[in-house]
Amino acid sequence: MAGKEKAVWPPVWAAGAMSGTSFDGVDVALLLTDGVRIEAFGDAREVAYSDADRAILREAMGAWPGEARAEVAAQVVEAAHITAMVDLPDVALLGFHGQTLAHDPEARRTHQVGDGAVLANALGVEVIWDFRSADMGLGGQGAPLAPFYHWACARWIGAQGPVAILNLGGVGNITWVDPSIEGPELPGACLAFDTGPANAPIDDLMVRRGLGACDVGGALAARGEIDLKILEEALEAPWFDLAPPKSLDRDAFSGLADAVSGLSDADASATLTAVSAGAVARGLAHLSSRPRQVLVAGGGRKNATLMAMVQDALGCDVRAVEDVGLNGDALEAQAFAYLAVRVARGLPTSAPSTTGVAAPVGGGRRSKPGARELS
């Protein structure tokens, strides 16, 4: 593929693990990288949470350290990650994000459960974790965390001009990438921010009404009518006018549940899906130049109704990342493998244009099996 620059360091195999705010399960992926370029993709897998575990995680949302519900959630997260990775091939490093329960960038607080030292001892591999704290300590939002990897992906696919990678998870986030810039931390290489609610309000609606874990394929929304008044009011929220970089807690738009409470199941799903698509359009309005393509990762790309609404709202080429040879189910897990190698090699993992941090900074604590934390 294009973008195969000469390696600065010998590439190593690393694993990355991600448990997102859609509560689907643990995504694990292997990546061969030198921390700058992508050399090769390895195996990827997802281990789904049980209904009981998913309920525990939902109950723990919004919890801060010290709360009993957070401790129970941590046990679920650690056990699921160990199960997902116990039989992986040997790797040099594991990048572990943990499960976000609460995120308040204005107060410089964030909470991901899951102890990297527990995983290091259980799996016998060095674990790099807690990627957000250093960034937030220097004034950053602590999120989004995948933009530097998105830059590497844009170069790997040989993008010839600006491209945007949109992740539609519980919260949506987008990275605008100029692949001609020689490093992701350099000015002009990346602009990244959360776009707003994505799958979370739709998923919560389905669970609340006993309709399942998600609107599979957007089939329910496709049968509904959009309530334009609710849509317009939702997209008038002041948050959408804030200049990036910016990040959002999963439940920041939880008031949407009350807004659609009087609608039928189909109309409620259609309206929330339109809000998610409209949030992406509001986000792209902050970009200084339009990307040639918007490549979509995350569970939302499997929602045909949401994808069609995003296409209509943006009016540019919108397609799933699989169309350019990437794995949308593994992308975020791969990102943490990539970031782990960057941390191990002293490279930045965020920059002013991705999180608002004062200067490029490398985040992440390091835990080796049977040893004290390294940093």
UniProtKB/Swiss-Prot annotation:
Q: Where is this region: Disordered?
A: 351-375
- InterPro entries on file: Anhydro_N_Ac-Mur_kinase, ATPase_NBD
Which reaction is catalysed here?
Answer: 1,6-anhydro-N-acetyl-beta-muramate + ATP + H2O = N-acetyl-D-muramate 6-phosphate + ADP + H(+)
| Pfam families xrefs | AnmK
Note the superkingdom of the native organism: Bacteria
Keywords linked to the UniProt accession:
ATP-binding, Carbohydrate metabolism, Kinase, Nucleotide-binding, Transferase
Upper lineage is: Bacteria, Pseudomonadati, Pseudomonadota, Alphaproteobacteria, Rhodobacterales
Role: Catalyzes the specific phosphorylation of 1,6-anhydro-N-acetylmuramic acid (anhMurNAc) with the simultaneous cleavage of the 1,6-anhydro ring, generating MurNAc-6-P. Is required for the utilization of anhMurNAc either imported from the medium or derived from its own cell wall murein, and thus plays a role in cell wall recycling.
PANTHER family in the record, alphabetically? ANHYDRO-N-ACETYLMURAMIC ACID KINASE
Q: What is its EC number?
A: 2.7.1.170
UniProt-listed Gene3D superfamilies: 3.30.420.40
Q: Name one GO biological process term.
A: amino sugar metabolic process
Name of the protein in its database record = Anhydro-N-acetylmuramic acid kinase 1
Native species: Jannaschia sp. (strain CCS1)
Enzyme class name: transferase
The positions annotated for binding ATP are 20-27
Pathway(s) of this molecule: Amino-sugar metabolism; 1,6-anhydro-N-acetylmuramate degradation; Cell wall biogenesis; peptidoglycan recycling
Stated family = Belongs to the anhydro-N-acetylmuramic acid kinase family.
The UniProt GO MF terms for this protein read: ATP binding; kinase activity; phosphotransferase activity, alcohol group as acceptor
